[in-house]
């Protein structure tokens, strides 16, 4: 199996309780499972203001969100190992973990896994797509030693 090179950008003032770069690389690698060569992605941890602005600009939603995925769209004739960017909002992740009574690191892992799958082209707009993606997320999370992230919804 190949590896995932993560460009970690911390754009939040409070860094207490954030996952380490090693954890993020482990979670991203589990989700992406690169074959052969190294692939690259950016993970940017932001505050609510930046998440809100990006969510409004790119999705038309007037609120911050937990994770945004921006797949890299490379011309076919160019071969670059870039997957894209994840933007994860610290406050939203912390709030959701508390509301869902999940361990904070489990929710961070889930956001990296979820976003990583989006970079690979998975989606959850249609019910069948959502079922496939959630099943894969559950398998990956359990492989990392975490509980099913959708257990409370089942």
Swiss-Prot record:
Enzyme Commission identifier(s): 3.1.-.-
Record GO terms (molecular function): metalloendopeptidase activity; RNA endonuclease activity; zinc ion binding
Keyword Zinc among UniProt keywords: yes
Domain of life where this protein originates: Bacteria
Cofactor info, note text: Binds 1 zinc ion.
One GO biological process term: rRNA processing
Keyword annotations of the record: Cytoplasm, Endonuclease, Hydrolase, Metal-binding, Nuclease, Ribosome biogenesis, rRNA processing, Zinc
Pfam families: YbeY
Cofactor(s) needed for function: Zn(2+)
GO annotation, cellular component aspect: cytoplasm
Disulfide partners: none
Subcellular location field: Cytoplasm
Enzyme kind, highest EC tier: hydrolase
Residue numbers binding Zn(2+): 114, 118, 124
Chief location of this protein within or outside the cell: cytoplasm
Family, similarity comment: Belongs to the endoribonuclease YbeY family.
Protein task: Single strand-specific metallo-endoribonuclease involved in late-stage 70S ribosome quality control and in maturation of the 3' terminus of the 16S rRNA.
Name of the protein: Endoribonuclease YbeY
Source species of the chain: Haemophilus influenzae (strain PittEE)
Lineage: Bacteria, Pseudomonadati, Pseudomonadota, Gammaproteobacteria, Pasteurellales
């Amino acid at each position: 199996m190949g590896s995932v090179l993560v460009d970690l950008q911390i754009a939040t003032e409070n860094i207490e309780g954030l996952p380490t770069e090693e954890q993020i690389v482990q979670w991203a690698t589990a989700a992406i499972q690169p074959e052969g060569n190294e692939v690259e992605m950016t993970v940017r941890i932001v505050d609510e203001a930046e998440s809100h602005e990006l969510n409004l600009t790119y999705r038309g939603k007037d609120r911050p969100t937990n994770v945004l995925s921006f797949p890299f769209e490379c011309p076919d004739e160019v071969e670059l190992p870039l997957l894209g960017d994840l933007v994860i909002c610290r406050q939203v992740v912390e709030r959701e973990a508390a509301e869902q009574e999940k361990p904070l690191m489990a929710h961070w892992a889930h956001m990296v896994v979820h976003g990583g799958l989006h970079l690979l082209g998975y989606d959850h707009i249609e019910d069948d797509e959502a079922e496939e993606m959630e099943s894969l997320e559950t398998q990956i999370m359990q492989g990392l030693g975490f509980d099913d992230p959708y257990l409370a919804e089942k």
